Amino acid sequence: LTAFLGYLMAVAAIFLDIGNTLRILLKEEPYRTEARQKIVSLIGTSESPEVFCTELERRYKEYRKWAFEHLSEAPEEELWTRGLAPEFPAQRITPLAHELTYQFRQSMGRRVMADGCKEVIHGLHARGYTLGIISNVITTSEIPNWLAEEDLTRYFKSVLLSSSFGRRKPDPSIYLEAARRAEVAPEKCAYVGDNFSRDVTGTRAAGFGMVIILPDTAEKDEAVAPQQQPDLQDQIQQEILKR
């Protein structure tokens, strides 16, 4: 961490993304199949898991388009009763919304912690940095549960998810609220993410002092606008989350 920490001398708080930063997605088909089966069982449909979940994915893409355009995140109950499964009785679906969201995310694949992630968190915390999480996710419970399972909850002073806040990155309000909860001025905050357009644009607008990008493989060859250039990227990848 020596080289990475040298860049952060003026930073008091470090906020981390979840997807492709703290965790990676493994598209393991048996795992996905089991989740699809659980979804149809919870919903109570007679359709096959494959047919039903194919339509579910189509509807989710429509929802994502709306969410991107409006920088908003719907509550899980509304996501299911209005967006993903509106043809089923709301009074039956609403109590199942959180579990349905969890299983829907599992139907995309198994999420595992990035290599070296825990050691990085421990190291940054030991050096006195205030740590936080800012992430766009449709679930309100999966991330807190994961942090508890990995005994990481105590390391994060501020955990802000779009699903609970209602606004998505790159809306600057989600970054500003996370900094407020951490009790650190935005200019003394750094953000570590994987997306040039979302993570750089939002943190810049919020006045964060530094943006660090560990780009996903699919993004590395894409053109990046000048205003989307981070402060640091690949040169610190070995010092932070070795994926």
Regions found by a protein language model. Name each.
Residues A10-E119, A126-R127, T140:
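N-terminal helical cap/lid subdomain that shapes the substrate entry/recognition surface
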Residues L1-L16, I24-L26, E47-E50, K118, ...:
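Asp-based, Mg2+/Mn2+-dependent phosphohydrolase catalytic module
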